[in-house]
Amino acid sequence: MFTKAAFSSLCASRHAPISVAVRGIANIPAHEYHIRFDQRVGRKRPAQDVLDRFKRLNNGMWIHAHPGRHKLRYMKDETWQKTSLYYETCTKEQCEILDKLMTPYWLRPKHYPNDPYSAYHVRHNIDSPRVDDRGNFVRERKKVLMDDSTSQRFFKDC
């Protein structure tokens, strides 16, 4: 039936190593690694993945849910189950990257009724100047004409 050469070539082709596709730059979809532009309108499009996974606060910080918070919860201890439901803040570099992926509409402050994040839009007890997306100084409360030590002693933002 089979000659020895035909049988050996058949076995050799069966045991040939399988080439596995590596996720290099050529295999990453184009929308994942660059800012997209709408061809009809001719302006930048917001990255939908960022809108789905992150929330931008009115002070310019981005927050996101704890990764893996719904995975194998029954195996985790109670402390992890409690803290995994918290939101995490992004670093300064991450916030800058996320701002570049968004359009100016999403960088403006948003005011929603019954916003669950309303307590987090104002940063408390931070002495550094607050700057909005245009570089303008932003105040959380009305300016009081007194020195900072007196205002910190008698006036609280809480």
Curated annotation (Swiss-Prot):
Q: Does the keyword Ribosomal protein apply?
A: yes
Keyword annotations for this protein? Answer: Mitochondrion, Ribonucleoprotein, Ribosomal protein, Transit peptide
Q: Enumerate the subcellular locations listed in this protein's record, separating them with semicolons.
A: Mitochondrion
Q: Which domain of life is it from?
A: Eukaryota
Q: Which GO terms describe its cellular component?
A: mitochondrion; ribonucleoprotein complex; ribosome
As for family, the record states: Belongs to the bacterial ribosomal protein bL35 family.
* Protein name as catalogued: Large ribosomal subunit protein bL35m
Query: Which taxonomic lineage is given here?
Result: Eukaryota, Metazoa, Ecdysozoa, Nematoda, Chromadorea
Question: By which gene is this protein encoded?
Answer: mrpl-35
